[in-house]
Amino acid sequence: MRALWIVAVLLLGVEGSLVEFETLIMKIAGRSGVWYYSSYGCYCGTGGQGWPQDASDRCCFEHDCCYAKLTGCDPITDVYTYRQEDGEIVCGGEDPCGTQICECDKAAAICFRDSMDTYNHKYWRFSLENCQGESQPC
């Protein structure tokens, strides 16, 4: 619980896409990213190594890979805009970095929604000591 409190406090001062990512997860998956995914498996949260533990952890792995492909963008602080059209999230705006970050976040939120039935509470607050070995390539 302490770790979640720390994450929540840190997010209060964040002006960039971390807050937007949380909002997208809530809109698309209908659950809190901070609560369910800030410390899940080997890839959800800070860091990431080893192999994803399940489909939800793979969503975070793919999200990390998506961010890694961005050049000249800061997914932690860059702000983006999106809108809803007929129930769908549409990333947009004049900033190409913001649009790319939004697309990464949107894909992860959709992945979380689609893998909800495989979410396993044993991977929540999973010790990174269990995530040894080489990471899977993107």
UniProtKB/Swiss-Prot annotation:
InterPro entries found in the cross-reference section: PLipase_A2, PLipase_A2_Asp_AS, PLipase_A2_dom, PLipase_A2_dom_sf, PLipase_A2_His_AS
Subcellular localization: Secreted
One GO BP: lipid catabolic process
Cellular component, GO annotation: extracellular region
Disulfide bonds: 42-131, 44-60, 59-111, 65-138, 66-104, 73-97, 91-102
Modified residues (Pyrrolidone carboxylic acid): 84
Proregion positions: 78-83, 119-124
Entry's Gene Ontology molecular function annotations: calcium ion binding; calcium-dependent phospholipase A2 activity; phospholipid binding; toxin activity
Pfam families: Phospholip_A2_1
Lineage: superkingdom: Eukaryota
PANTHER family registered for this protein in UniProt: PHOSPHOLIPASE A2 FAMILY MEMBER (PTHR11716), PHOSPHOLIPASE A2, MEMBRANE ASSOCIATED (PTHR11716:SF9)
Function statement: Snake venom phospholipase A2 (PLA2) that inhibits neuromuscular transmission by blocking acetylcholine release from the nerve termini.
Subunit structure of this chain's protein: Heterodimer of an acidic subunit and a basic chain. The acidic subunit is non-toxic, without enzymatic activity and comprises 3 peptides that are cross-linked by 7 disulfide bridges. The basic subunit is toxic, has phospholipase A2 activity and is composed of a single chain.
Protein name, entry field: Acidic phospholipase A2 homolog sistruxin A
Source species of the chain: Sistrurus tergeminus (Western massasauga)
Classification lineage: Eukaryota, Metazoa, Chordata, Craniata, Vertebrata
